[in-house]
Amino acid sequence: MNQVFKGWSRGMSTSRGRSMRSKVESRMRKESGKTLREIRRAKKLKKKLMTDEERLIYNLKRAKKKVALLLQKLKKYDLPELPSPVHDPELFTSEQVQAFKKIGFKNKNYVPVGVRGVFGGVVQNMHMHWKFHETVQVCCDNFPKEKIKEMASMIARLSGGVVINIHNVKTIIMFRGRNYRQPKNLIPVNTLTKRKALFKARFEQALESQKLNIKKTEQQLRRMGVNPEDPVAMASIHRVASTFFNAIDKKEGTPYVFHGDKQSERGTSVDNREESEPGDEDSDQEELDRFIAEIEEAADKEWEEEEAAEQEESGRIRYWNREEFAGRSRTPELRSYGDASHGFRRNDRDTHSQRRPNDSDDDDDDGELDSEDDEIPKRFDRARSSNTNTRRPREDFKRRSPDPRPRPRAQVRSDDDVLSDLDNTMWDSEDEEDAPPANYISSSDDDEDENRTVSASSSKQSRFRNNSSRDGINNSKSKSGKQRDEDWDSD
């Protein structure tokens, strides 16, 4: 086992007595390669070994690079200013301005301007307010005082309104004009979309923060005695800082470790670099040009990606219905009404299940709803058949069932349905006790029925009148309670 983990134990163990300089030297010798991975690790190690002045200078250069990149990105969002529309200048007297100002304070309608600034949506909302009001309040609470007048002039140019007053520094009262007519396109042509306005606001916010960061870093450098605007001082700091890294690149050792044989060589290399400073100016110019080209390329690439994302989002919003239903559009009203109709029928079945007779199943309600239209012609057919004297002898002895259609086959039901049937039978038994007894027809009423059929056949009136007369005879021939008891006993 010791032989197996021998290599691992050597790799994980560290020798005692090694100083920090020896560790840095060995690490820098390993990081002197030219591969991408080694270059990244070398840059990371450079940051760790920087002094305070070097770190501040590095942060200052990095912040200036970010500012250049943000300025290049913001150039993409600059829109050409269209010529202002030609209209009659509206001149107001002081009394008219005061009257419109009073109207603007009285009307509480307002349009907020958020982090996106003034874009097409703000102008559209103003036109929607001007449809019913003469004035509108534009609230610019997220912007500094210096930008309010600039925003007021921009809003007046895009909307065609008149600035009446700037109230409490952050609220602009806009008047629509005397001869105002709502334009056909509420969103002006030379305005940003909602998405692009948000990206522009983010870049402007990042630019302001980078400017503050640069100002703070320059103040810290001045406190240390270094003038950030002095090119000579900056060049000397860069020269001192680059001696260490140039020595590593040329594998001449490090300035932290003394090498007697290579000390003179290192001194001569520094002299050669001082002599070759004029040639370095050209390399700096080439590096600057390359940096500008990289910034422009990165800005163009990001703009193209943003345009593609915006087109994809607009297409998704426009055709979301087709994507969801695979090309078949279905309105939400139909979906809601369909679900509601099923729920209504289900609830109606549950509420009426307690009042049904015992011999009807739970699944018969749907059939009863469908068979309501079929019961009307059956009644008329029964009236026609009564004209002919072909009656079955024991037809009147049968109990009249509320549902004339045949009963379906018994289905297998779960335990819950069986329990619900037991509850229904209990309810029905109580209802039968409270309800009046049913009306039965006995054999003693055959003569009366024959007389009714003869009178019905002799009359030449309409079918509707026959039905009404038969109902009247049935109501007049109602039996007493004693006769119904006798009929029950005879059955």
From Swiss-Prot:
Keyword RNA-binding in record: yes
This protein's record includes keyword Lipid metabolism: no
One GO term describing the cellular component: mitochondrion
Domain CRM: 90-187
Record's keyword terms, sorted: Mitochondrion, mRNA processing, mRNA splicing, Ribonucleoprotein, RNA-binding, Transit peptide
Composition bias type Basic and acidic residues, residue spans: 22-34, 255-265, 345-359, 392-416
Compartmental location: Mitochondrion
Disordered as annotated region, ranges: 1-34, 255-287, 328-491
Role description: Involved in the splicing of group II introns in mitochondria. Required for the splicing of mitochondrial introns found in nad1, nad2, nad4, nad5, nad7, rps3 and cox2 genes. Splicing of mitochondrial introns is crucial for mitochondrial biogenesis and function, plant growth and development, and plant response to abiotic stresses.
Name the UniProt record assigns to this protein: CRM-domain containing factor CFM9, mitochondrial
Lineage summary: Eukaryota, Viridiplantae, Streptophyta, Embryophyta, Tracheophyta
